[in-house]
Amino acid sequence: MTKKNQPLRIIPLGGLDGIGKNMTVVECGPDMVLIDAGLMFPDDSQPGIDLVLPDYTYVLENEEKLRGIIVTHGHEDHTGALPYLLQDLNNKVPIFSSKLTLGFIEGKLAEFRIRSPKFREVKSGSHISLGCISVDFFSMTHSIPGALGVYIKSPQGTVMHTGDFKLDQTPIDGVTPDYAAITKFAKQGVDLLLSDSTNATVPGFTKSEAEVGPTLNEVIKNAPGRVFVASFSSHIHRLQQICNAAKASGRKIVVTGRSMLTNTRVARELGYLKIDEADIIDAYDVNGIPDDKIVVMCTGSQGEAALRALAYGQRRAQDALDPLG
């Protein structure tokens, strides 16, 4: 069979049966590309299990075909399996993603002592060729900056993979989906659409993230003591609004929890999270500041939950201010 006649194969290894473990193989003859490498956090019916990984045995068995890994955005359900996969691969494979996503991945890999990964930064409008598979990237709006969708072309067909998205017309960072690029690719032809379908059966539209801001401002302004606000540590748009509300009410910001500290640092260094240095204080310095002048940003759900431990009495309030907690 000639290269031109090689079939295009799409092999989902995770992500289609729930939230988490996103990993999809795109294979064309001697070439293979992996889209995302995420993990899933266990539910209450899985005691003793810390996390769940997709079964990527097929990737390891066909490692010589793997030309690259594309990561659509920086959430754990799309990046969390990368350290484990890279440790199991014999060769360094290039990882393609946006600046912020690569920043988050770099921090995660450092925890596993994976040094000098082959990062390749891409953005909306970027084009790459990986063997007989070519990929165009376009921006998507999500709860995290730097989210990308991909348009894949091969001799045997075209695939559009949206990544996770939220059609928000007033996003916090002003970056809307690249409708022009999506329209262009649609006109070129799409043989298979792989689309985010979270809450697709729920009627109506998801409200804009910008609508959260006024409520945060009001709650934080009127709270009589310390305010603890829980969020995913990668939800940079939400964190920005928390910081804005804290500053508007004259409160200092305390960041607590390992993942929250890491992600806020990376987002600030790369310019995605705008906080004045004077508005942040170290968790060890809170005792000298009145309670009504403090906002604590902590994680609140799934495998990194600081707030859940607080709510169930598993940690004291002061312990929650341990920056390594």
Segments predicted by a language model, with ranges:
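Conserved two-lobed SF2 helicase motor
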Residues: 293-302
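ATP-dependent carboxylate-amine ligase
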Residues: 322-325
